[in-house]
From Swiss-Prot:
Residues 859-870 have a biased composition (Pro residues). Glycans are attached at residues 141, 317, 319, 379, 641, 649, 661. The lineage of its organism: Eukaryota, Metazoa, Chordata, Craniata, Vertebrata. It comes from Oryctolagus cuniculus. The gene is DAG1. This is Dystroglycan 1. Residues 463-485 are annotated as: O-glycosylated at seven sites with GalNAc. Residues 832-846 have a biased composition (Polar residues). Residues 316-485 are annotated as: Mucin-like domain.
């Protein structure tokens, strides 16, 4: 009876305890598959003993907000304002850092006063950066209690990103950016200021402050400026058509190029007023404003970046294969981004992926395979969620998958769906990669180290495969695992390296040293990875290696191509870069080297000439010695950039070397700068200074130096210095010291050979023309020999018998010769003896009306001729009295 009473008292107590434990077990078993809103449902159903635990969990659940993703371009300023109303903060401490880390990327700066995130990325910062923004409440014990959190991404594009797109991304006024954009393939005129600064040593705030100071100085908008470091010591642009010096006498740091756009296709005549840059840069005003020395400035036309040439190679068409897996459970996609909590798995919605289009088969409705491995143990998840990106042509995959960060340059994985299988994507390669990874309890896409990956079903006629995919998981942040997609590396045959980015074209100038570092993303090999892990070889056509005496050389260890062309190499040259992996397979990239004429031509303001001891033949025939000479000459002037020296000529007379300095402006004559350079390397009498001698020894020993003006300074002589009594303007530009009679140059050849020959030829031509004119004038009016033969005899003409008319006797000279058709003369006029009043004097106006002949009067007397003259008329045109009568020649009687 007592036991029955005790049992009746214990039954209600055990019943309530058993019911409570049963509810907790059911809640734990259903928690992983329910959405996060189940917290509020279970809060109303559980007992008061668990209410405090769920209350703490509800307070720790962050509020997900949407901060839009951003884009940045290498060398251009980036700025984004974090909206505090989206975070929901009211007096909390806002913390901004890289997702999963405690600090920001090296190129970003957070300003807590203005709530702005700004920076300037460099070439090493390309890729996607995930930024976490969280607000924390300060506790009484000094610790920070998280209140809200959000994650957004910033994708950094390379420097040669599309200019209009980059301008639109950075410019607040889209209409202004569109109006200022140049036409397609139209060169953009850019003004560049060279600073003696190192961007890699600057903090993000110092870079932005430098741009702000230049903005206030030049009144150029911040989004139009570009700030990049100097690459390969190329401080100056050889294609610049205008340039000027700065106040820096010596370059110490690596150098920075600060540039902005002036217009489209401008030249020296149409460029806008640049006096606001030219004078301040030379006088030091710009340097004082910016806080860094100014080396110089130049203006050049930049051609817009053209899209890379796409190889039209037909790849093997993949065959989709349906993989049969275990039963799957389709989980509905939640409408919002869910941040993992200490007791719930993370479910990340897909976002947009910037990936190139592919030709892979698009799978149907994919589902995620979920495998249950016993009881699920809840472990706290550290670090915020990181969003993933899915291409526009891809599919939306649902499931308990944690977002991953894809390393830039590698292929981004996709969640596996069955059926059918998905494909792993890589740029410009159509390759199916079936695989079936499963999601474990930590909800990541990485496999456990002890799990053997599943071998996919072989796919026929597939000759290209995707490169290895590296993934950095976000949970836990202190341990990063790498995984590969597809078949394990040990079971695959060696793959041929692939060409990813073409070298395309290299520009070089006559007499100017150039060097090109082969980018690491030019080739890619599945086993050996990037280009710097491959063996590169430079070859000509038909697998012919570049010789030791070629003007182009290649260092396979440093993967550096360099050279020094001369005037005989002007034009286009084709070369082939071979990349070979450790297995012996290789890939080839064909590119061209365009050699242009000297950038300054004959307009250089000064010519430097030095005489060295030795024979010039070994220097002329050895490209390595010529390059060493150019480098030593640049070092003697204090320039680390060897492209500032343009080699003009190497002639006999020991070793006579001529060169110009590309840093000198063409107009007006930079007399002060040339004088400074002259005093740096030589004395006034032409002897080299010790600094110049030490810079070139022991390979080259200088004996004398001469510096003469040319171009805008053609009337000046710098070294040796002209005597004070003779003005420097009377010195001809070709005059050189007479210490060495064997010295010669192009000017001497023209002066002593070409010009005299042309003058003599012109004089001879003019003399010949004058002689011909005089001869023709003297011969004018003279008969030819044939005409002279006709009138050579002045005798009586010969008349033949048949030509003589015997019917009429020859006329006699005593009687007048009257023709047969003649008539008798008219009778003489009648002269009345008395004066008639009607008669009009002959001197009157009517003299023309007097008619002496009266043919109409029949009674008129005959004409009476006037009496002959008694005295001969001696006057002009009178005949002689006695005239010899005409005698006919005797008739011709033939023999």
């Amino acid at each position: 009876m007592r036991m029955s009473v005790g049992l009746s008292l214990l039954l209600p107590l055990w019943g309530r305890t058993f019911l409570l434990l049963l509810c907790v077990a059911v809640a734990q078993s259903h928690w992983p598959s329910e959405p996060s809103e189940a917290v509020r449902d279970w809060e109303n159903q559980l007992e008061a003993s668990m209410h405090s635990v769920l209350s703490d969990l509800h307070e720790a659940l962050p509020t997900v907000v949407g901060i839009p993703d951003g884009t940045a371009v290498v060398g251009r300023s980036f700025r984004v304002t974090i909206p505090t109303d989206l975070i929901g903060s009211s007096g909390e401490v806002i913390k901004v850092s890289t997702a999963g880390k405690e600090v920001l990327p090296s190129w970003l700066h957070w300003d807590p006063q203005s709530h702005t995130l700004e920076g300037l990325p460099l070439d090493t910062d390309k890729g996607v950066h995930y930024i976490s923004v969280s607000a924390a409440q300060l506790d009484a014990n000094g610790s920070h209690i998280p209140q809200t959190s959000s994650v957004f991404s910033i994708e950094v594009y390379p420097e040669d990103h599309s200019e209009p797109q980059s301008v639109r991304a950075a410019s607040p006024d889209l209409g202004e950016a569109a109006a200022s954009a140049c036409a397609a393939e139209e060169p953009v005129t850019v003004l560049t200021v060279i600073l003696d600064a190192d961007l890699t040593k600057m903090t993000p705030k110092q870079r932005i402050d430098l741009l702000h100071r230049m903005q206030s100085f030049s009144e150029v908008e911040l989004h139009n400026m570009k700030l990049v470091p100097v690459v390969n010591n190329r401080l100056f642009d050889m294609s610049a058509f205008m340039a000027g010096p700065g106040n820096a006498k010596k370059v110490v740091e690596n150098g920075a190029l600060l540039s902005w756009k002036l217009g489209c296709s401008l030249n020296q005549n149409s460029v806008p007023d640049i006096r606001g840059v030219e004078a301040p840069a030379r006088e030091g005003t710009m340097s004082a404003q910016l806080g860094y020395p100014v080396v110089g400035w130049h203006i050049a036309n930049k051609k817009p970046p053209l899209p890379k040439r796409i190889r039209r190679q037909i790849h093997a068409t993949p065959t989709p294969v349906t993989a049969i897996g275990p039963p799957t459970t389709a989980i509905q996609e939640p409408p919002s981004r869910i941040v993992p909590t200490p007791t719930s798995p993370a479910i990340a919605p897909p976002t947009e992926t910037m990936a190139p289009p592919v030709r892979d088969p698009v799978p149907g409705k994919p589902t995620v395979t979920t495998r249950t491995r016993g009881a699920i143990i809840q472990t706290p998840t550290l670090g915020p969620i990181q969003p993933t990106r899915v291409s526009d042509a891809g599919t939306v995959v649902s499931g308990q998958i944690r977002a991953t960060v894809t390393i830039p340059g590698y292929v981004e994985p996709t969640a596996v769906a069955t059926p059918p299988t998905t494909t792993t994507k890589k740029p410009r390669v159509s390759t199916p990669k079936p695989a079936t990874p499963s999601t474990d309890s930590s909800a990541t896409t990485t496999r456990r180290p002890t799990k053997k990956p599943r071998t996919p079903r072989p796919v026929p006629r597939v000759t290209t495969k995707a490169p290895i995919t590296r993934l950095e998981t976000a949970s836990p942040p202190t341990r990063i695992r790498t995984t590969t997609s597809g078949v394990p590396r040990g079971g695959e045959p060696n793959q041929r390296p692939e060409l990813k980015n073409h070298i395309d074209r290299v520009d070089a100038w006559v007499g100017t040293y150039f060097e090109v570092k082969i980018p690491s993303d030019t080739f890619y090999d599945k086993e050996d990875t990037t280009t710097d892990k491959l063996k590169l070889t430079l070859k000509l056509r038909e697998q012919q290696l570049v010789g030791e005496k070629s003007w182009v050389q290649f260092n396979s260890n440093s993967q550096l191509m360099y050279g020094l062309p001369d005037s005989s190499h002007v034009g286009k040259h084709e070369y082939f870069m071979h990349a070979t992996d450790k297995g012996g397979l290789s890939a080839v990239d064909a590119f061209e080297i365009h050699v242009h004429k000297r950038p300054q031509g004959d307009k250089a303001p000064a010519r430097f000439k030095a005489k060295f001891v030795g024979d010039p033949a070994p220097v002329v025939n050895d490209i390595h010695k010529k390059i060493a000479l150019v480098k030593k000459l640049a070092f003697a002037f204090g320039d680390r950039n060897c492209s500032t020296v343009t080699l003009q000529n190497i002639t006999r007379g020991s070793i006579v070397v001529e060169w110009t300095n590309n840093t000198l402006p063409l107009e007006p004559c930079p007399k002060e700068q040339i004088t400074g350079l002259s005093r740096r390397i030589a004395e006034d009498n032409g002897q080299p200074r010790p600094a110049f001698t030490n810079a070139l020894e022991p390979d080259f020993k200088a004996t004398s130096i001469a510096i003469t003006g040319s171009g805008s300074c053609r009337h000046l002589q710098f070294i040796p210095v002209a005597p004070p009594g003779i003005p420097s303007s009377v010195t001809p530009p070709t005059e050189v010291p007479d210490r060495d009679p064997e010295k010669s140059s192009e000017d001497d050849v023209y002066l002593h050979t070409v010009i005299p020959a042309v003058v003599v030829a012109a004089i001879l031509l003019i003399a010949g023309i004058i002689a011909m004119i005089c001869y023709r004038k003297k011969r004018k009016g003279k008969l030819t020999l044939e005409d002279q033969a006709t009138f050579i005899k002045k005798g009586v003409p010969i008349i033949f018998a048949d030509e003589l008319d015997d019917s009429k006797p020859p006329p006699s000279s005593s009687m007048p010769l009257i023709l047969q058709e003649e008539k008798a003369p008219l009778p003489p006029p009648e002269y009345p003896s008395q004066s008639v009043p009607e008669t009009t004097p002959l001197n009157q106006d009517t003299v023309g009306e007097y008619t002496p002949l009266r043919d109409e009067d029949p009674n008129a007397p005959p004409y009476q001729p006037p009496p002959p003259f008694t005295a001969p008329m001696e006057g002009k045109g009178s005949r002689p009295k006695n005239m010899t009568p005409y005698r006919s020649p005797p008739p011709y009687v033939p023999p």
